[in-house]
């Protein structure tokens, strides 16, 4: 049966000021331009204010500045930040199917595993010896958890996650399907053309409240640990190489590649498809815009960009030609400066 939520109930969740019928109910959340009378919507960008007046939504989440753009008949939740309010309400109204409770008959649990209370382990999952799973941990179907790994309370691994041996994952983490944690780092020595593999004997240590997207790889350290601190969020298809250290509260968008022994500070924002060199540091509160190529340390907080924004092919060819000719132009300018002086 579809659950419904009243205006007043939702206002309590986000500390909102109410305008309209406190008893009106909605069932779910929809985009501003599509929401119907049984749905809640929100506005987080002023360029969409023109849509407010004719919105059919049962409830609108708006800021004080948005109110005058709404119909007098609209039921409003008035808040300081509608987008944050939306995030809180989306959690409260979340209808994502829950994982099956209990331990599946086909799960393989080795001797010496310590299970907390209310642990759930899905079909065909393998939990090797020495593993410690905290209270309310959820291990999805077909997951593998290697020897002596520790997973903190309330953490969930969706189906088909692989966690190698000696990994530590904190409490209340969420790891999406296909992610691999603790695989070997890319460590080799070259002996006259022959690659000699260096065993990767370090760990991966992940803090609390960390979320990791689907099909991301986090390599174990060569000697010391690869470290992901508390409250880090990492999107899909990222490569985190051995001995990377990511600071508290940093967000990493999809497709990012971080080379080995990189240190990323706290509260950084790393744009999608960025590539960051290893063996260097990025300070706290740095934003790297999408497709950034970072080859040197960053020592000052701020926003950094690289790359060429999209152009027509004709414009891009001109830009490329000019770029290739910069050295010659520079030499001619220096020659002119020398003559003038």
From Swiss-Prot:
InterPro entries: Hexapep, Hexapep_transf_CS, LpxD, Trimer_LpxA-like_sf, UDP_GlcNAc_AcTrfase_non-rep
Keyword set includes Coiled coil: no
Keywords: Acyltransferase, Lipid A biosynthesis, Lipid biosynthesis, Lipid metabolism, Repeat, Transferase
Record NCBIfam families: lipid_A_lpxD, PRK00892.1
SUPFAM superfamilies given in the database record: Trimeric LpxA-like enzymes
Biological function: Catalyzes the N-acylation of UDP-3-O-acylglucosamine using 3-hydroxyacyl-ACP as the acyl donor. Is involved in the biosynthesis of lipid A, a phosphorylated glycolipid that anchors the lipopolysaccharide to the outer membrane of the cell.
Family membership noted in the UniProt record: Belongs to the transferase hexapeptide repeat family. LpxD subfamily.
Catalytic activity: a UDP-3-O-[(3R)-3-hydroxyacyl]-alpha-D-glucosamine + a (3R)-hydroxyacyl-[ACP] = a UDP-2-N,3-O-bis[(3R)-3-hydroxyacyl]-alpha-D-glucosamine + holo-[ACP] + H(+)
Entry-linked HAMAP family: LpxD (MF_00523)
Entry keyword Nucleus: no
The gene coding this protein: lpxD
Active site residues according to the UniProt entry: 242
GO biological process entries: lipid A biosynthetic process
Signal peptide boundaries: none
Pathway in which this enzyme or protein is active: Bacterial outer membrane biogenesis; LPS lipid A biosynthesis
An MF annotation (GO) of this entry: N-acyltransferase activity
Superkingdom field: Bacteria
Protein name: UDP-3-O-acylglucosamine N-acyltransferase
Documented EC number(s): 2.3.1.191
Entries under Pfam families matching the protein: Hexapep (PF00132), Hexapep_2 (PF14602), LpxD (PF04613)
Any GO CC annotation of this UniProt entry: membrane
Oligomeric form and interacting partners: Homotrimer.
């Amino acid at each position: 049966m579809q659950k419904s939520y009243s205006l007043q109930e939702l206002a309590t969740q986000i500390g909102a000021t109410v305008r309209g019928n406190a008893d009106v109910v909605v069932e779910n959340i929809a985009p501003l331009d599509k929401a119907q009378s049984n749905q809640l919507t929100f506005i987080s960008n002023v360029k969409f204010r023109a849509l407010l007046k004719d919105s059919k939504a049962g409830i609108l989440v708006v800021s004080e500045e948005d109110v005058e753009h709404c119909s007098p008949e609209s039921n409003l939740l008035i808040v300081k930040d509608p987008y944050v309010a939306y995030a809180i309400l989306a959690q409260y109204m979340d209808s994502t199917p829950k994982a099956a409770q209990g331990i599946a008959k086909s799960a393989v649990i080795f001797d010496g595993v310590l299970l907390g209370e209310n642990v759930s382990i899905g079909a065909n999952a393998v939990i090797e010896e020495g593993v410690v799973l905290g209270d309310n941990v959820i291990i999805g179907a077909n997951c593998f958890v290697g020897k002596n790994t520790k997973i903190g309370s309330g953490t969930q691994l969706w189906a088909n996650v692989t966690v190698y041996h000696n990994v530590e994952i904190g409490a209340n983490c969420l790891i999406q399907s296909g992610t691999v944690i603790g695989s070997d780092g890319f460590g080799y020595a070259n002996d006259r053309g022959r690659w000699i593999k260096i065993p990767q004997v370090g760990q991966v240590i992940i803090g609390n409240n960390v979320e990791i997207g689907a099909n991301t790889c986090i390599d174990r350290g060569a000697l010391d640990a690869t470290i992901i601190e508390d409250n880090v969020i990492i999107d899909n298809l990222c490569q985190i190489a051995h001995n990377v250290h990511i600071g508290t509260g940093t967000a990493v968008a999809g497709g990012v590649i971080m080379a080995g022994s990189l240190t990323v500070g706290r509260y950084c924002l790393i744009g999608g498809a960025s590539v960051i060199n290893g063996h260097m540091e990025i300070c706290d509160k740095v934003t790297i815009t999408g497709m950034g190529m970072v080859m040197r340390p960053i020592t000052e907080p701020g926003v950094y960009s690289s790359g060429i924004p999209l152009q027509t092919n004709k414009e891009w060819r001109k830009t490329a030609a000019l770029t290739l000719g910069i050295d010659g132009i520079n030499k001619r300018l220096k020659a002119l400066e020398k003559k003038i002086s």
